[in-house]
């Protein structure tokens, strides 16, 4: 079939398998051009490995370090009549290229919050890898069924303590609008922490330790975003921020548990990028469109693969990691440069419907958004028939 993009709100309901494959190949090419990651990981588990930063972490491990990788994700395959999710096609492409290189690459499709997926993962590590030396935690999910109580928690994106009004960008209508977000209730904050906080990361590491599948010197990292004051009211100081602060608490206990192995646990702070998760945050499309404009002008623009590749080389496996006073690894420093943030702030209130394309890089934002789903990727012929029914060999289905 011939597949065209169909966008509804902050999601594209169609995906293009050939475009997703080309997108993965571009990321692989970027990492390989940088050369090997010195002293990089050899056997890697990526929890949330199919899109965005998690996919970039899997690509960097495999093609920067020659690592065997096991990926965990929750994606939907395509059929002859309907495309699957982008994460499915990304993972199929990743495995194809990894196998061509002679690397081990297997994936588990299921709910990473569940005990069953943790059990399947441990079984697979024992059978195929023995032990892993890096665990990347990169889950973005709207809800979580607690594996012990069965309770279902949903995350919300709201400020804490007071309602907040701010400028936003309606990406469908391409108009600037004022948005008001009501304050989260205590229950909503607690539920968001239950979904997006550090408890599940801790459960994963506890399960892996108990099963004795973490190698000596094993590292683990979970990804976070801090941002600057423009986004603080709805992000860092909001319900999502409460979950991210929980990561900062939980990492301390995880680090202590890995100490006997000579291991380490760190939260890694990455820059704002276009992902399916970030496009759902009301102010992010406008912020990102301005950020892209400013950072491209300054020659410092980066996407997921540039960020994660740099994180591995500089901090996770670098001689002098970039640490902040909280002990987090920082890869977001270019975004937070005062000259970047002050310019974004200066332009923030000047953007109108008329000058949207002139003052911001909304065109670049839209293009990167479509790239997520396999569209507008260079070198892909979108008039060609493609088969949406793509298999992932040796997939372990939970």
Swiss-Prot record:
GO BP annotations listed: fatty acid biosynthetic process
Catalytic activity: a 2,3-saturated acyl-[ACP] + NAD(+) = a (2E)-enoyl-[ACP] + NADH + H(+); a 2,3-saturated acyl-CoA + NAD(+) = a (2E)-enoyl-CoA + NADH + H(+)
Residues carrying the site annotation Plays an important role in discriminating NADH against NADPH: 75
This enzyme's EC code(s): 1.3.1.9, 1.3.1.44
Disulphides: none
Description of the deletion phenotype: Cells lacking this gene produce significantly more unsaturated fatty acids than wild-type. The ratio of unsaturated fatty acids to saturated fatty acids in wild-type is 0.76, whereas in the fabV mutant this ratio is increased to 1.12. The major unsaturated fatty acid is the C16:1. When triclosan is added to the reaction mixture, the reductase activity decreases to 15% of the untreated wild-type.
Gene Ontology molecular-function annotations: enoyl-[acyl-carrier-protein] reductase (NADH) activity; NAD binding; trans-2-enoyl-CoA reductase (NADH) activity
Keyword annotations of the record: Fatty acid biosynthesis, Fatty acid metabolism, Lipid biosynthesis, Lipid metabolism, NAD, Oxidoreductase
The keyword Lipid biosynthesis appears for this protein: yes
Activity control note: Not sensitive to tricolsan.
Pfam families: Eno-Rase_FAD_bd, Eno-Rase_NADH_b, Enoyl_reductase
Enzyme class: oxidoreductase
Binding positions (substrate): 225
HAMAP family: FabV_reductase (MF_01838)
UniProt record similarity statement: Belongs to the TER reductase family.
Subunit structure: Monomer.
Function: Involved in the final reduction of the elongation cycle of fatty acid synthesis (FAS II). Catalyzes the reduction of a carbon-carbon double bond in an enoyl moiety that is covalently linked to an acyl carrier protein (ACP). It can use both crotonyl-CoA and trans-2-decenoyl-ACP. It is able to convert trans-2-enoyl-ACP of different length (C2 to C16) to the corresponding acyl-ACP.
Protein name per its UniProtKB record: Enoyl-[acyl-carrier-protein] reductase [NADH]
Provenance organism: Pseudomonas aeruginosa (strain ATCC 15692 / DSM 22644 / CIP 104116 / JCM 14847 / LMG 12228 / 1C / PRS 101 / PAO1)
Species lineage: Bacteria, Pseudomonadati, Pseudomonadota, Gammaproteobacteria, Pseudomonadales
Gene transcribed to yield this protein: fabV
